[in-house]
Every structure is written in C-alpha cells, then in structure tokens.
Amino acid sequence: MAKRSIYFCGSIRGGRNDAQFYAKIIQHLKQYGDILTEHVGHCGPEEEGLDDKTIHDRDLAWLLQSDVIVAEVTQPSLGVGYELGRAIAADKLVLCLFRPDSGRRLSGMIRGAINSVNFFVEDYHQDEYASKIDQFFTVRVTRP
C-alpha cells in the first residue's frame, strides 16, 4: 500500500518563533504519511545554498504531488498564503490550524475560503494540535 504524502506549511521567512512547535506537529503527522516538507520544523538556518527559484519550484512540485496539506497559519506568512492559494486551485484537501489566543486575527482570505468540502480551518489551543489533526484525518481523509 502506498503511503500518503503530506505537505506541511508553516512560516519560514515570515518568522521562526513557532519552528519548534512545527517540529512537534510534523512528528505527529508522520503517523499519517510521509512529510514532504519536514525542513519547515528545523530550527537551523533556512535552506542554505538554495536560490528562491529552486525553493519555489521544488516546494510547488511537492505541494502538487501531495495528498493532503496541513498548514499552521498563526504566524502570518506570505509564502504560506501563496501555498494555500495554489492548494485551493489544485483542489487539494487542506487543514489550516490557527491559535486565536496568539492575539492575531486570521486573514479573511484564509477563513473565508472554508468550504466544508476540502478546505477547513480549525481554531485550537496549542495543547490541542494532536487531537485536531487526529480528528481531521479520521473524518476527512480517506485511506491511501
């Protein structure tokens, strides 16, 4: 049986305050498939030696080949917004996770994209990330 491919989105250049938390989310997601973007959870220097075009083309190819996209959208990021727009255009199954207790407001372009078919946004507290992911994969994601 083929393993499911999961594309995880999280802020890189928009701010790395949540990088360690992204690593926890990624670790939890591994039970559901292969994570194509595990580097998003690394706390070291961002993708040394890769130019912007290479990063864009590689990440877009991964996004398009993925079965599911999970995005942590609390830290605003132009790149994550772009990835989500491309995911919607490609009719991908998407879960966005947002922490309202961060003091931020989620963009209307993200929350307004909820369609109850393949684009979902879950508000959560940081200690609830695993249960929100588990619920999504149990209810929304079909077996690979």
Swiss-Prot record:
Residues the entry annotates as binding substrate: Y7, F8, C9, G10, S11, I12, R13, Y22, H39, E83, S107, G108, M109
Role: Catalyzes the cleavage of the N-glycosidic bond of deoxyribonucleoside 5'-monophosphates to yield deoxyribose 5-phosphate and a purine or pyrimidine base.
Gene Ontology cellular component annotations, sorted alphabetically: cytoplasm; nucleus
GO biological process: one example: nucleoside metabolic process
Main location: cytoplasm
Enzyme superclass (EC): hydrolase
Name under which the protein is recorded: Putative 2'-deoxynucleoside 5'-phosphate N-hydrolase 1
Highest taxon in the source lineage: Eukaryota
Subcellular location: Cytoplasm; Nucleus
One Pfam family here: Nuc_deoxyrib_tr
Subunit structure: Monomer and homodimer.
Family: Belongs to the 2'-deoxynucleoside 5'-phosphate N-hydrolase 1 family.
Reaction(s) this enzyme catalyzes, per UniProt: a pyrimidine 2'-deoxyribonucleoside 5'-phosphate + H2O = a pyrimidine nucleobase + 2-deoxy-D-ribose 5-phosphate; a purine 2'-deoxyribonucleoside 5'-phosphate + H2O = a purine nucleobase + 2-deoxy-D-ribose 5-phosphate
Keywords from the named record: Cytoplasm, Glycosidase, Hydrolase, Nucleotide metabolism, Nucleus
MF (Gene Ontology): 5-hydroxymethyl-dUMP N-hydrolase activity
EC number: 3.2.2.-
